Amino acid sequence: MAFPIAVALLVFPAIVGLLSPYATADYVLFTGEVLMAGQNLTNGQYRLAMQANCDLILYEGEIPIWGANTVGRGDDCYLGLKQNGELVVRRGVHYTLWSSSIKSKKGKYALVLDGNGRLGIYGQRRWTSSNQKEVGLLDGSTVTTEYVLFSGDRLMPPRKLKYKNYELEFMRCNLVIKDDQSERILWQTSTDARSCYARLETDGELTVKHKGQLLWGSNRKGSNGPYIAVLRFDGRLDVFGPLRWTHDGHHDSLSSNASFPSKI
């Protein structure tokens, strides 16, 4: 996974060149985290790679489909997501080489590489589950699969979200976050019915329903738009949105014009 920015800048010289280019299956970057040289966001055949030559490249398989054109402009470069929702490639602490150029209010944001090769920045954070942050070591042998729910999507058995040993799933009609290693229930909706599904609404509210009847809601609504619910590395579930910035590498070349994608 990515490093917190303060930690990354302290340990950068010690770890550069030691990370495998396929070292992570994460495809979400949170505010305050960075991708350093050799690290990636990876979702299926798509990979956003921060390379040792300072360039940020989006790959489809082994084919580059977009780049930030920052190659050769430093040897201590990293990708970061700022508290104003701006995505930046920097060298050193403050020298910006590339920017998404879209800024919002100070808060917590999330960058997602989806399964179709699109990048999106969502924020601010609208809601978070009430359980405490988990601070134990994650199971490195557990493969991270699907851990993001997009607005308009339903989560119903047997589908579940899973990040390492954390799972968001239904136990009968009760939506729970569970530590799969210890079998502990970290959070739950305490809902009860014969059949249920969870849905992330287009106003950002997370709901549990039975045949369209509302059984539970997060009670945090925003303006209509695309939102995401993310099962985090600390065992909590966060909702971010709406979508602030997006980029589809399939629709841009590797020219400098592709360095500043569109605002939503």
Where are these regions (language model features)?
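Beta-rich ligand-binding surfaces for carbohydrates and other polyanions
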Residues: A2-I264
